[in-house]
A protein has these predicted regions:
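N-terminal non-globular leader segments, chiefly Sec-dependent signal peptides
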Residues: 1-78, 84-86, 93-100
Length: 100
């Protein structure tokens, strides 16, 4: 894997978190997505909380966000986040932020 000049930490989700996510993925027939993983390590994404409805979504930008979060499970230093369509693994350092 080339570094490409990125200073992004080369941290991977723990084995325990991956096993937990795989079990849920098999049970609920949902894909596991890691496209928010690196961004969650560098605070480049957040858990957006809509002020009007208290609905939660993962947000990278105004154009990049997930479907509604149905459940957030803590697994060690990570969260396994279930949405309507997918399972995301993010760092537990991810911050909630109010969105409109």
């Amino acid at each position: 894997m080339s570094s490409g000049g990125n200073d992004v930490p080369k941290t991977l989700p723990s084995d325990t978190t991956m096993r937990n996510a795989v079990g849920i993925a098999i049970e609920q027939d949902k894909p596991i997505l890691l496209d928010y993983w690196l961004d969650s390590l560098t605070n480049a994404c957040c858990i957006g909380v809509r002020e009007s409805t208290n609905e939660k979504i993962l947000v990278k930008s105004s154009d990049a966000y997930t479907s509604c979060i149905s459940k957030i499970l803590r697994s060690g230093d990570e969260y396994v986040i279930l949405t309507e369509n997918s399972i995301y693994i993010v760092s537990n350092k991810i911050k909630p932020r109010k969105i409109t």
